[in-house]
Amino acid sequence: MKPNNPPRIAVLLVNLGTPDEPTAPAVRRYLKQFLSDPRVIEIPQFLWAIILNLFVLPTRPKRVAEAYASVWEGDSPIRKILNQQVDKLHARLEGSMGPFNISVHPAMSYGNPGLPDVMDKLCAEGVEHFVILPLFPQYSATSGGAVYDALTKWSLKQRNLPSYTIVKDYFAHPLYIKALADSIRRFQAVHGKPDKLMFSFHGIPQPYADKGDPYPKRCKCTAAQVAQELGLSQDEWIISFQSRFGKQEWVKPYTDVTLEQWGKAGVRSVQVVSPAFSADCLETLEELAMENRDNFINAGGQEYHYIPALNDDEAHIDLMEALAKPLVAGWASTLEGWT
């Protein structure tokens, strides 16, 4: 006999996070949560707590809030775009799996809507199966690893656990590579081809990579495959890493240093794409599109363009559907009495 209602399956699109508003107090709350995660800062926690509370949080939130204010239009860009991605993927999946009730929801590792809160709410509403899709194309312990941690901590508090599957990453998925290449082609059809195309990825400290974090290798694989898809020669593109924090060495080459060197060396035009970001955010709209543009132009460069992230582009939603739908179908096939 079938139950009265078909089983509920939820797909969660998870991104890093954002403050609730572009103010120093809101940014301070967000940074405290983010920078307190030992996945992000791998130094002894008692020592880092002193540095964070005495030196970072008293000064950094005001500067970061001003940067957020420069890109804030009614809401944080990353949350606004995440909601758009959710709506589009929901429209694709809703009603596509027979009698099953499938929904798509946003979640964040830090800030709101927090992943544990979303899980609590949906479980209370009767969701029994989850597909978790972290929107970090290249897995790193500092990003995707934090999603695994949050789910593990949440699970330890549950009496009746739901089923869930996590998509680790998709750095070489053919639809991802094609979507990136096509977005670059469309941009260059309007703005022309540059002297140099830069693939700028968010950096991680070099010691993290030395300990086995696969992120840099995944970034290099993504960039190389997109460059190959575009038919670029080796001297037409480069991979670099941005957003250094603190004084330790990070994975090189550095985006800002490379741009300054190019400007001084006579490189006239540069276009920058940042494949690690599934949605435009502070690091792309302010750091890449504005701050690093100034670095390049002030060093002697003449033309600089940032190529937007995939955001809610239909090809990006195609990728998300291709990642989520087989897992949703997998859950559906195990639900005896409803298949």
Swiss-Prot record:
Fe cation binds at H202, E283. Its EC number is 4.98.1.1. It is found in: Cytoplasm. PROSITE patterns: FERROCHELATASE. PANTHER family: FERROCHELATASE (PTHR11108), FERROCHELATASE, MITOCHONDRIAL (PTHR11108:SF1). Keywords: Cytoplasm, Heme biosynthesis, Iron, Lyase, Metal-binding, Porphyrin biosynthesis. It comes from the Bacteria. Catalyzes the ferrous insertion into protoporphyrin IX. GO terms for molecular function: ferrochelatase activity; metal ion binding. The keyword Cytoplasm applies. This is Ferrochelatase. Pathway: Porphyrin-containing compound metabolism; protoheme biosynthesis; protoheme from protoporphyrin-IX: step 1/1. GO terms for cellular component: cytoplasm. One of its GO terms (biological process) is heme biosynthetic process. Belongs to the ferrochelatase family. It catalyses: heme b + 2 H(+) = protoporphyrin IX + Fe(2+).
